[in-house]
């Protein structure tokens, strides 16, 4: 911990939500630092070891049923260890994170109390980054359907080509013996919005996208933004809060 020596408390009323958030981070990185502050609530930012993808989590104070924090503080956590504990959390469990300078105590309540304690890692203080990319096209869609798209194509190739022209979004994969494509029209019921200042096309790693669909279970909608041969931005809104969400950035790879 870097900051106040007082205990910091975060209370989540829905166990499934906090479990999926932890899994979304652990899918990208083993260790990460998050910040808790009276102004911003909970903020996490971490770059994967290959520096190909970044994950960010934003949970404003209003997201929590209870939050106690005196001043901005940073905490380093081993998410691989934390996710093992969170796998025991049921959907209707109430989960508390109690943080000191040395430890994270996870309290799970549902008829009785379960307590687990993790030692903290040295934190690495950060400033929230946003990529300096002019995203020219995007689609906002039912988040539950994005995993269907990825799973449909993952057996075809190790890369996926995404293109958006404002009227349709196409997801394609091909190998020497097979080519598959999924087309989502602007008028399809899964689409909430689609736009393009100019058409965009880029290729991304399938393995990374597979790991980036974990928040779909706790999000009503996901927004994909892109530009030709530029990184992809995915944002999952969480809990009906405008500022709450899980965000990924994924670097593009060479063309197919």
Walk through the language-model features, giving the residues of each.
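DNA polymerase sliding clamps and clamp-related checkpoint/processivity subunits
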Residues: 1-26, 31-155, 163-256
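Polyanion-binding surfaces on beta-sheet-dominated domains and ring/shell assemblies
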Residues: 160
């Amino acid at each position: 911990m870097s900051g106040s020596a007082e205990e910091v408390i975060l209370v989540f009323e829905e166990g499934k939500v906090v479990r999926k958030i932890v899994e979304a981070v652990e899918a990208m990185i083993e260790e990460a630092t998050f910040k808790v502050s009276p102004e911003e609530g909970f903020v996490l930012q971490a770059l994967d070891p290959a520096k190909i993808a970044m994950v960010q989590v934003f949970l404003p104070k209003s997201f929590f049923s209870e939050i106690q924090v005196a001043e901005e503080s940073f905490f380093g956590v081993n998410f691989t260890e934390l996710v093992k504990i969170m796998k025991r959390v049921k959907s209707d469990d109430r989960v508390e994170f109690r943080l000191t300078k040395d430890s994270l105590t996870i309290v799970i309540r549902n008829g009785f109390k379960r307590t687990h304690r993790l030692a903290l890692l040295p934190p690495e203080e950060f400033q929230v980054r946003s990529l300096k990319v002019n995203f020219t096209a995007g689609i906002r869609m039912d988040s539950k359907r994005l995993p269907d798209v990825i799973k449909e194509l993952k057996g075809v190739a190790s890369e996926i080509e995404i293109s958006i022209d404002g009227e349709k979004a196409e997801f394609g994969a091909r190998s020497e013996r097979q080519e598959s494509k999924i087309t989502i029209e602007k008028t399809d019921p899964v689409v909430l919005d689609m736009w393009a200042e100019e058409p965009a096309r880029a290729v991304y790693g399938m393995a990374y996208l597979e790991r980036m669909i974990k928040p779909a279970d706790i999000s009503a909608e996901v927004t994909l933004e892109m530009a030709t041969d530029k990184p992809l931005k995915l944002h999952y809104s969480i809990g009906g809060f405008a500022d709450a969400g899980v965000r990924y950035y994924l670097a593009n790879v060479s063309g197919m």
